[in-house]
Amino acid sequence: MKEQNLNKYDEITVQAASDYIDIRPIFQTNGSATFNSNTNITTLTQAINSQAGAIAGKTALDMRHDFTFRADIFLGTKSNGADGIAIAFHRGSIGFVGTKGGGLGILGAPKGIGFELDTYANAPEDEVGDSFGHGAMKGSFPSFPNGYPHAGFVSTDKNSRWLSALAQMQRIAAPNGRWRRLEIRWDARNKELTANLQDLTFNDITVGEKPRTPRTATWRLVNPAFELDQKYTFVIGSATGASNNLHQIGIIEFDAYFTKPTIEANNVNVPVGATFNPKTYPGINLRATDEIDGDLTSKIIVKANNVNTSKTGVYYVTYYVENSYGESDEKTIEVTVFSNPTIIASDVEIEKGESFNPLTDSRVGLSAQDSLGNDITQNVKVKSSNVDTSKPGEYEVVFEVTDSFGGKAEKDFKVTVLGQPSIEANNVELEIDDSLDPLTDAKVGLRAKDSLGNDITKDIKVKFNNVDTSNSGKYEVIFEVTDRFGKKAEKSIEVLVLGEPSIEANDVEVNKGETFEPLTDSRVGLRAKDSLGNDITKDVKIKSSNVDTSKPGEYEVVFEVTDRFGKYVEKTIGVIVPVIDDEWEDGNVNGWKFYAGQDIKLLKDPDKAYKGDYVFYDSRHVAISKTIPLTDLQINTNYEITVYAKAESGDHHLKVTYKKDPAGPEEPPVFNRLISTGTLVEKDYRELKGTFRVTELNKAPLIIVENFGAGYIGGIRIVKIS
């Protein structure tokens, strides 16, 4: 019970039943005792004169084992009320209750040892003159005219007139309307019996006041006269006389080795019409045992039996046995009389190719019951099945079931697989502008059959056709057919209209002396596709190439490819190797000199450079020149020169001159223009172009670029004009 500050009786009545155990399995009430099943509290006596109540054990204890008894007790509200509560462990019969009054319901218990909580010490049954202070509790004292309330271990049958003290008695607080916790422990190994009594509330003590009696007390009894090879039962009693009090107890724990006999018997299932003997029927395995008496199977009697094996149903048999000490046990088993179960399943029709699970398909309507009407559908299994949903025909499924009683049943049903018609047709490849009638073209190979093998080709129709033979591509034709059973089928074929593949490749310029691989050079941008758009670049080959990057000029590369359909195509690109292509990206002057003869100097400035990191810059009017090897030019051929220039500020002229003889007289310029007249390109540079013709090649000619103001020259190119 939870500790609470409870001062009134009516407050304790609200304690939850879960705080205390239900005593009815091990106790029976006697006299004025009543048990409240809502609170699990037993009232031994009301506050009425001349009452006597007890709860006596319905079983026995094996004293070879320890036990613990814990309970909350209520001794009443009247400080001079009578008589108290006692508990005894004895060798008497089951249900024994001793002398009432001062005997507290335990006096006379055979070979018993008790513990009394006596609140009225002047009863005729109270002991006098003992050596444990029991008699000293009698008399009339200030505040205690009926003797001192006290507690301690007593013998229940040493003296037939009173309970005899076995150990030192101790005073306890008079009844005060409070609950107290009593704990009694038996230590079988050390043969020691102890008791502990504790008040549960303390709010009646004023600060600074010392209580007259202890609030917690302990008692010990060493080597009590228990016969350990014998059974002991127990009784808890209370009484009132000329004075009274309300006496109650709520048992928290009784942890002991109880020794009542035990019946063992199993539930059984019996086939309808079988002979049934409740003591010998196989599977019941009827048996009764007792710790002391041993095997009691022969003493079992059938207390009740309503089994009728002529009719299915659930019946009950109750067995009873009693040991030599009067303890008893009952056991009721369940007897189920059963017949074979039943299975219900219907014939079904399914489509060819359909997924079919006979156990779960709702069309089968599978259900099963045992003979008691319990649903056992989940226990049904497929015993056999030859169903092949890929082939039309009639098949058989056999179900089986075994119920929980061992009864068996089988059920077979028919499964008809209804097939669909089939269409056969081939994929087709066509040339552009070929004609195609999908229903009659022999290349399609169109045929249809119903599920019985009958030819229904004449019933085929074209459901969809997007073929356009004027354009290459992948197309589709869908056929459909309905047979005489109403079953339908469709067939899709692929029609490929094939054209030539295509190659994409760019004309490119390659620097003199540069390594050039036409198949992999990213400037070429080589790609190839078949007429259906599939990439076939990896299949492209070089059919021919006359490229010689050691000599400036114009060259050709011819690519070719054949697709998986055998279609072939070629592609020719032009490759130009410039005479000059100097943009100074890497800082190399590439043979350019000042007109006086020394190498030009380049400025490293990525922001000002046209390409890369370097650019030619001069703040003055300056001319630069480069000698062209005779081998890089062809006589009677036109060439184009391009200069990329940028004025530092404002605008000025830029002149380009071609001198066929470096030592010869001045020649007309290729062009002499304001820089601003050029085409605007990257980084504010202007592109200026002009052409010249090579008419003789006796000496290595000279190209002169003259910048008439401060500015930048980002690059110079010379290429042959076709």
Swiss-Prot record:
The cross-references to CDD domains, in alphabetical order and at most eight, read: lectin_L-type
Q: Does the keyword Transport apply?
A: no
The entry's protein name is: Pesticidal crystal protein Cry22Aa
Source organism: Bacillus thuringiensis
Q: Which UniProt keywords apply?
A: Sporulation, Toxin, Virulence
Function field? Promotes colloidosmotic lysis by binding to the midgut epithelial cells of hymenopteran species.
Q: Name one GO molecular function term.
A: toxin activity
Look up the record and give one Gene Ontology term from the biological process aspect: sporulation resulting in formation of a cellular spore
Pfam families, sorted: Bact_surface_Ig-like, Lectin_L-type_dom
